[in-house]
Amino acid sequence: MSLHDADIREPLFEFLEEKYGKVRIIEEKQMGRSRADVVMVLPEAVAGIEIKSDADSYVRLGRQVKDYDRYFDYNWLVVGSTHAMSSREHVPEWWGIISAEQIDPEKPVLDFYTIREAKRNPGADVKKKLKFLWREELSHIQKLNGMYRYSSKSKDFVIRKMAETVPEEILHRQISEELFERDYNLYS
């Protein structure tokens, strides 16, 4: 049976929670000119996950890789079994690769295999990652770090000041904390 994106998502989320413990999953997040299929928030990092099911092609992947590499600390390509052998050719060596396979066609159970572990992305830009945060979340990080609020300045100005002032390792942790605590009900 050929796997589609919808067949992979929920079992993938369970696999990631088993593998990493505390995670927050955000689906379909715009970043640059691409949309991340899945954003996985970890305690000190944010990972981007691109799903290429058996029904997908690699046509847009080149552009997607460039966008993912600007925003995320780690990146994963999750592929259906038809792409498992060729997947390495399409992403940089720091990208992790996970294969999703349906062992028994009679059962909707998937097995996931790590083909390659993700390594820290050398091109990630903390300023790009800060753009994922809402203005209130940025204000909270400013407060935590004793920064002036700059309430009349643009979001880009505030992000630039934060990146200049707060050590990156602290920002990585604080960005994750804000995303873990985000309450989507406040704006629904």
Could you tell me what each predicted segment is?
Residues 3-43, 161:
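Active-site metal-binding core of divalent-cation-utilizing nuclease and nuclease-like domains
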Residues 56-99:
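Catalytic cores of nucleic-acid endonucleases
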Residues 45-54:
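Active-site ExK catalytic segment of metal-dependent nucleases
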Residues 31-46, 88-105:
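Conserved N-terminal glycine/acidic-rich loop preference
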Residues 1-2, 148:
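General N-terminal leader/first-domain-start detector
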Residues 96-188:
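Non-catalytic C-terminal interaction segments of nucleic acid-processing enzymes
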Residues 33, 55-56:
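Short acidic loop-to-helix transition motifs that present clustered carboxylates
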